[in-house]
Amino acid sequence: MTSQRFQELLKNVKTNLGSVWVEFRSSVEERLKHPHIWKIIDREQLATILMFFLGIPKMFRLSQNMKIRQMRNMRKPGVMEMTPDTNQTEQPCPSQMTNTETSKEPESVSLNSSTKDGDLDPNKQMKNLRRDSSSSQESADLEEDHRMLGGRMRMIFKRRQGMRKKSQSLSHLRSQAVYQDTTEAAISPSTWKSFWPPQLRLRDDNSWSSVNLSQTDPTKN
């Protein structure tokens, strides 16, 4: 991007935003003059600069998401949380001073027990309920996933076992058929008729009988 184009973009943005852009540009120009600019500008400011210079909506969404994330971090317990000062006790009104001591004792006991247990804070109760519900939902989801995965694994195992048994039975039948073919070919006399000596003749009952060559060979007559 040339400097002339950059100046044109600056003028366009300045005319559109008015006085807000003047303050923003002055702060950006002061930061851009610094040699270690990338160490000064954080991600949110860089996203805002890119949003104004290039007009990318994604950068604007990034800055908004970062702001939302910062607000969520502020709401987390233990991070910038204003804890109430339990040491400072409120002084009762004169109308409350007229009450008897017997009416004050159960209130103090209940307050102390409730503050120790933390039952009076509705935010903590809601957080605990949400945490319990989320943990129970996660455990239920995990159990469902394990159940579905176990069912799928069992189905795959049974399918593979059935395919293995089927292949074994097919191979057994194939080998048995080949064995039967070979035994039938070996035992059948018709297959050995051409290889048998000419002085033997096959009978109708598949038995062999010896004959003379003069009786079988017409050339001998």
UniProtKB/Swiss-Prot annotation:
Disulfide feature: none
Compositional bias (Polar residues): 84-101, 183-193, 207-221
Region (Disordered): 75-149, 183-221
Compositionally biased residues, Basic and acidic residues: 116-133
Domain of life according to the entry: Viruses
Function: Does not belong to rhabdoviridae replication core genes, and is specific to sigma virus: protein C is presumably involved in host-virus interactions.
Stated name of the protein: Protein C
